[in-house]
Amino acid sequence: MSLQSIKYSRGSLEILDQLLLPGQSKYVVVRGVEDGWKVINKMQVRGAPAIAIVGCLSLAVEINPEDFENKKSLRQEIEGKLNYLVSARPTAVNMKIAADELITLANELYKDEAIDVTQMKHRFLDATEAMLKKDIADNRAIGANGAQAILQGVAKAGKAPAGSTGSVRVLTHCNTGSLATAGYGTALGVVRQLAELGKLEHVYCTETRPYNQGARLTAYELVHEKFPATLVLDSMVAALLRAKNVAAVVVGADRVASNGDTANKIGTYQIAVVAKHHDVPFYVAAPLTSIDLAIPGGDHIIIEERPDREMTHVGEHRIAAPGINCWNPAFDVTPASLITGIITERGVFKPAELKEAITKLLES
């Protein structure tokens, strides 16, 4: 059974505090929007899909017990609080897209004279809760599509390890599993699907400095699932791809531009460069909500920068010389030219065909 990072029932929300993993499993109560903003900003919850789900559910928890005088006050509350939640971590587009969808819904309900303020509130709560269920279903579809793409690519290239009966070795970066989503995972969902098919020989995960999401979170999930797995340092990727016959790299995404350029956890770009050099397919696994058609290319993506302390300290222990300057971008942008395919719940697309394909899907 996969880990549960989000516990929700109407009026109640708890999140697994990922800052304490793997040493301690502790759930934090989120009582409203201010709590939601804080757990997102402090990275107690992280991963673009999970950020969106927790942000929206924090608003649902806050407004659930409230009685609003009229529909206008409810609409204003929804719009103001959702826009505030977007500011917690601006690089992840999922929260912005979810906020825009819910604000649009609130405006439609406000204009609908057939429903009163109580009905409007419950319709809004229903829509917010539906996002939780949809994320899990989408992740399972991403897993199935990604596993199929990798296995077909391996069969075509003849790259399966000798004696592996078609099983594959894959590399992943950061954390994209149940801890980063409502459940199952995106890139780690692809790994999970390979395992369910009996086609996973081995998975390698990077430590993912400086926050160590790979070492703390992905390794934690892989051990929990009893997958054959090995942790490697970020600086070992080139040697790994040269020595271990890795069939594919699969990573997640915080934002994908319309041309396929992808913002993901810092270190993704260099892995893609190394994969290209070693002729290893490089896949991005992300729901449609991570694709921002309004952004033409990666140069337009805002990159969040994190505090120096995340680089200079591990816990309370300083590991860097006092007085040293630090540059700590949380994400980098991988050019579309380095990406083999973008795995979504609706199929796998080459970056060059992404904008047209997604536009057609959204119109259908």
Curated annotation (Swiss-Prot):
The keyword Methyltransferase belongs to this UniProt entry's keyword annotation: no
One CC-aspect GO term: nucleus
Subcellular location: Cytoplasm; Nucleus
Alphabetical keyword list: Amino-acid biosynthesis, Cytoplasm, Isomerase, Methionine biosynthesis, Nucleus
Signal peptide: none
Metabolic or biological pathway, per its Swiss-Prot or TrEMBL entry: Amino-acid biosynthesis; L-methionine biosynthesis via salvage pathway; L-methionine from S-methyl-5-thio-alpha-D-ribose 1-phosphate: step 1/6
EC number, as in UniProt: 5.3.1.23
GO biological process entries: L-methionine salvage from methylthioadenosine
One Pfam family it belongs to: IF-2B
GO molecular function: S-methyl-5-thioribose-1-phosphate isomerase activity
Residues that span the membrane, as ranges: none
Keyword Metal-binding: no
Positions of the record's site feature: Transition state stabilizer: C174
Residues at the catalytic site: D254 (proton donor)
Reactions catalysed: 5-(methylsulfanyl)-alpha-D-ribose 1-phosphate = 5-(methylsulfanyl)-D-ribulose 1-phosphate
Function: Catalyzes the interconversion of methylthioribose-1-phosphate (MTR-1-P) into methylthioribulose-1-phosphate (MTRu-1-P).
NCBIfam families: eIF-2B_rel, PRK05720.1, salvage_mtnA
Membership in a protein family: Belongs to the eIF-2B alpha/beta/delta subunits family. MtnA subfamily.
HAMAP family assigned to the protein according to its UniProt record, in alphabetical order: Salvage_MtnA (MF_01678)
Name of the protein this chain belongs to: Methylthioribose-1-phosphate isomerase
UniProt organism field: Drosophila melanogaster (Fruit fly)
